[in-house]
């Protein structure tokens, strides 16, 4: 791979549902629910994307989701969805805008092909360690489908030029616009198909020294590793083949909200609240913050809620 120092992206021919089927096809991400929940959500809906991203639901309850047959089923279903016209590939390479509305707040993301060498060279910044077993699971999924079924989420530095392009498209009628029944989140989608706009977006990203993974460390690692693997297997590798790119939705930093990632501890293991706080105090500086909700103020700062009180 050639060394990259700025972000490289490209438009791509998206594979997506027709307008009238999008609500039936759309699903939550693969990693926010278990097999039983996916089975329940997809019940009676043969068009649900869960048949591709959680294909174990098409097998008897208790089937190991890492069984080779399950991965093969994902590929079989992906082909079937295309054969039946539930997923259709666009004729030309586009960028797309995907907006999510949560609790009254909307964030607008650019859907792009991110560049594998950018991941390898650190232009795409990571902030989580990944587990090899989870990488391997997603790698098998990418390999067997020869596609990125789900995008990763990136943050990019605020950019007025991109804001203006996005504002122009989002003022128009969207291709998709629906509210998901399970969580009430709004999903809206536009296609950026004008060549001049596509070139402007590519050029603006080429000025960015870094993109940041907001969500999807394992999917990013898997896509990049499979891309590198395919490059190694191709004696005529040029660097512009499709496998050098993976699907990412990029949100400007000013629109991203960092949501709590909380953990519930069910009991104090026989300790009183005072003893528990004293034990925590051996490794942390503990400070009482009162009854109002307290959120971490910086790196290595945690908040703790115990017996009606907040602690830093």
Question: What function would you assign to each model-found segment?
Answer:
Residues 5-312:
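Surface-exposed, charge/polar-rich loops and edge strands
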């Amino acid at each position: 791979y050639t060394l990259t120092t700025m972000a490289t992206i490209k438009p791509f021919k998206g594979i997506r549902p027709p307008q009238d089927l999008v609500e039936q096809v759309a699903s939550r991400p693969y990693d926010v629910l278990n097999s039983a929940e996916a089975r329940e959500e997809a019940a009676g809906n043969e068009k649900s994307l869960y048949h591709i991203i959680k294909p174990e639901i098409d097998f008897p309850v208790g089937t190991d989701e890492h069984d080779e047959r399950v991965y093969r089923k994902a590929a079989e279903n992906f082909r079937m969805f295309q054969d039946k016209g539930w997923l259709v590939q666009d004729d030309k390479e586009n960028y797309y805008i995907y907006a999510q509305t949560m609790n009254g707040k909307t964030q607008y993301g650019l859907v792009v092909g991110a560049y594998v060498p950018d991941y390898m060279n650190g232009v795409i910044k990571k902030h989580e360690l990944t587990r090899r077993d989870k990488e391997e699971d997603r790698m098998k999924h990418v390999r067997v489908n020869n596609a990125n079924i789900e995008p990763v989420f990136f943050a990019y530095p605020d950019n007025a030029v991109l804001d203006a392009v996005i504002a122009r498209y989002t003022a128009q009628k969207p291709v998709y616009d629906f509210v998901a029944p399970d969580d009430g989140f709004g999903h809206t989608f536009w296609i950026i198909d004008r060549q001049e706009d596509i070139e402007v977006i590519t050029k603006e990203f080429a000025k960015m020294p870094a993109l940041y993974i907001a969500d999807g460390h394992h999917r990013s690692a898997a896509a990049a590793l499979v891309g590198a693997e395919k490059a190694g297997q191709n004696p005529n590798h040029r660097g512009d083949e499709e496998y050098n790119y993976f699907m990412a939705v990029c949100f400007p930093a000013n629109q991203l909200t960092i949501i709590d990632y909380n953990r519930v501890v069910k009991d104090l293991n026989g300790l009183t609240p005072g003893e528990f706080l004293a034990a925590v105090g051996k490794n942390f500086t503990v400070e009482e913050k009162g009854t109002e909700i307290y959120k971490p103020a910086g790196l290595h700062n945690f908040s703790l809620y115990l017996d009606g009180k907040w602690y830093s």
